């Protein structure tokens, strides 16, 4: 919570002016009953029309000034709350960008979206209402008591007895409801996550006829959220009737006491009206205060959740100064030295004691069963994750010694799930190199076998992509993603099963074009198909996180049982022709 106060400090002036103008408005509100009392006791009782008109003019003037004060307070409160929320949202987004994949996996995408949008909006609403009403309501209540004492001390005692009881009731309910609002927000996170999952997987759900099960699962989570909301709502709903009962009892006692004072001549009728108006003001302000407390409870709960995200430390730190990229020694592009890796919260290692060397210009194929650690291995090269033990070296330097920019310039990554952003094809291609020329873009598109895809579009490079490239096929998105990585001409290219949606002919052309790239580009090909990596200079065979084999295709056919099993599962007709003695295909 304290960490969030930093963002409100940037709006000190607005945070001071808004309550001050609200308090100025309160002063006029407190004077109104006294003016009304004068109209009754002096003007009406004495049939003094000029006096009534003059006091009515004063009331109109006070209303106009109070309205101006209210508008001014609202303006500065809105400026402070919106500005604070904007800076807070930017800070959270920047912090998310700095988090490693480990923290992102732990927190979850749905939770981060909720924190970034819903929770910060709730914080903004709380700041706005707090600056306007947090001082106004108590000041009205306290001021009404003081003004009541100036009218009649005996009647004012009713106020002194009533106010503490009301505060105990209001704040007692507040203390009970705050923890419950946190549970409501947690339940909302679950519903949001389920909604996102179902909408993203709607085609799979329909393909397996799981609509009824999905509806049932969502209904269960939604019912849990509803029950929590109803329970909290019932507790919060006690505020208004409870305050009304207490205030109405106090009003009855007040009128009875005031009537006695009028009968003995200690008070006038206008003063009774003034006291009752002060009691009504207290009723209105306590109702506002009750509503404000509910809003602030939600805002505090949301602020704590947002603060929790900001408090998550990033485990991935980059050096402040570069220089590692200049230290190129030897012909080894990538070296893994006894590398092991375990995902946060996982019981077993995903990679265990992996060691190999990839030389410049080589093509490294990586194959293995599902969950064998293929994607995990290549993600360590680009430092999406840090190894649990061992070292990952790029150009002879530990990846931890590179700045983020240096490593990003060296390594181009195309992941299995192709992600394109809303905008033109040209804009997406320039993610790899901001100053890329059209010639460079077309060169990359040609290598990625995406040239004909772009040429077929009416606007070609200016063709507008929808969010996540929804107006393209899966294969087209993969080819454009590969082209985006090729634009910056990386020294190391990682293709993480990124051609899975391509047909065999296009895939073969793509592999040939990448193999013929100019320069000493080291390419890592993660694939489920041996045909895609068969010609690689070196093939890594993974099984349950361990390196089962390392060598060329022919070498692995002789020495690696796991590789042979994968090969024969994809080419069963070759099993009979396999010569066990020579270890080659006949």
Regions found by a protein language model. Give the residues of each.
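Membrane-integrated ABC transporters
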Residues: 1-29, 36, 44-59, 65, ...
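ABC-type nucleotide-binding domain
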Residues: 327-586
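Helix-loop-helix
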Residues: 47-57, 147-161, 231-304, 309-310
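ABC transporter TMD-NBD coupling linker
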Residues: 199-203, 216, 279-346, 386-393, ...
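An intracellular "coupling" helix at the cytosolic face of ABC transporter transmembrane type-1 domains
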Residues: 10-13, 98-102, 118-131, 135, ...
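Short intracellular "coupling" helices and adjacent cytoplasmic loop segments at the cytosolic face
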Residues: 46-47, 82, 90-114, 118-120, ...
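Transmembrane helices of ABC transporter permease
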Residues: 10, 14-27, 38, 58, ...
């Amino acid at each position: 919570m304290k960490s969030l106060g930093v963002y409100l400090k940037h709006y000190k002036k607005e945070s001071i002016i808004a309550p001050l103008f609200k308090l100025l408005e309160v002063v006029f509100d407190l004077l109104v009953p006294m003016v009304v009392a004068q109209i009754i006791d002096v003007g009406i009782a004495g049939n003094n029309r000029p006096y009534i008109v003059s006091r009515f003019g004063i009331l109109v003037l006070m209303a106009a000034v109070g309205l101006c004060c209210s508008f001014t307070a609202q303006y500065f409160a809105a400026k402070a709350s919106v500005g604070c929320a904007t800076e807070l949202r930017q800070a959270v987004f920047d912090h998310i960008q700095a988090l490693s994949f480990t923290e992102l996996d732990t927190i979850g995408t749905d939770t981060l979206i909720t924190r970034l949008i819903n929770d910060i909006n709730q914080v903004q609403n709380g700041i706005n209402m707090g600056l306007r009403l947090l001082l106004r309501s108590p000041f009205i209540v306290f001021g009404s008591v003081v003004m009541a004492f100036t009218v009649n001390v005996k009647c004012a005692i009713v106020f002194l007895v009533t106010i503490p009881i009301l505060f105990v009731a209001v704040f007692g309910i507040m203390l009970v409801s705050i923890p419950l609002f946190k549970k409501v927000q947690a339940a909302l996170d679950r519903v949001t996550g389920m909604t996102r999952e179902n909408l993203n997987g709607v085609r799979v759900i329909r393909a397996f006829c799981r609509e009824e099960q999905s509806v049932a699962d969502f209904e269960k989570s939604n019912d849990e959220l509803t029950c929590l909301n109803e329970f909290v709502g019932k507790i919060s709903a006690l505020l208004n009737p409870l305050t009304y009962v207490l205030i109405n009892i106090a009003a009855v006692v007040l009128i009875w006491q005031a009537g006695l004072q009028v009968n003995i001549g200690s008070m006038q009728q206008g003063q009774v009206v003034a006291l009752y108006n002060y009691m009504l003001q207290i009723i209105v302000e306590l109702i506002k205060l009750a509503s404000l407390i509910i809003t602030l409870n939600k805002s505090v709960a949301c602020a704590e959740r947002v603060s929790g995200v900001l408090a998550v430390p990033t485990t991935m730190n980059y050096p402040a100064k570069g220089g590692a990229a200049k230290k190129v020694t030897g012909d080894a592009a990538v070296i893994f030295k006894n590398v092991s890796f375990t995902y946060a919260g996982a019981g077993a290692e995903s990679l265990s004691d992996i060691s190999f060397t990839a030389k410049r210009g080589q093509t490294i194929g990586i194959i293995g069963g599902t969950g064998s650690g293929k994607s995990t291995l290549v993600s360590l090269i680009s430092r999406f994750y840090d190894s649990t033990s061992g070292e990952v070296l790029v150009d002879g330097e530990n990846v931890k010694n590179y700045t983020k920019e240096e490593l990003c310039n060296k390594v181009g990554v195309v992941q299995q799930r192709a992600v394109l952003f809303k905008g033109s094809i040209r804009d997406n291609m320039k993610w790899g190199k901001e100053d890329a020329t059209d010639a460079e873009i077309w060169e990359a598109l040609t290598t990625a076998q995406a040239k004909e895809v772009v040429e077929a579009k009416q606007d070609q490079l200016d063709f507008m992509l929808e969010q996540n490239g929804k107006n393209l096929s899966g294969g087209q998105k993969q080819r454009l993603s590969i082209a985006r990585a090729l634009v910056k001409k990386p020294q190391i290219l990682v293709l993480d099963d990124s051609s899975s949606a391509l047909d065999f002919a296009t895939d073969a052309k793509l592999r040939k074009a990448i193999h013929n790239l100019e320069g000493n580009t080291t390419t890592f090909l993660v694939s489920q198909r041996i045909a895609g990596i068969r010609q690689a200079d070196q093939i890594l065979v993974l099984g349950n996180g361990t390196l089962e084999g390392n060598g060329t295709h022919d070498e692995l056919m002789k020495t690696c049982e796991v590789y042979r099993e994968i090969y024969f599962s994809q080419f069963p007709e070759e099993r009979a022709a396999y010569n066990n003695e020579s270890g080659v295909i006949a």
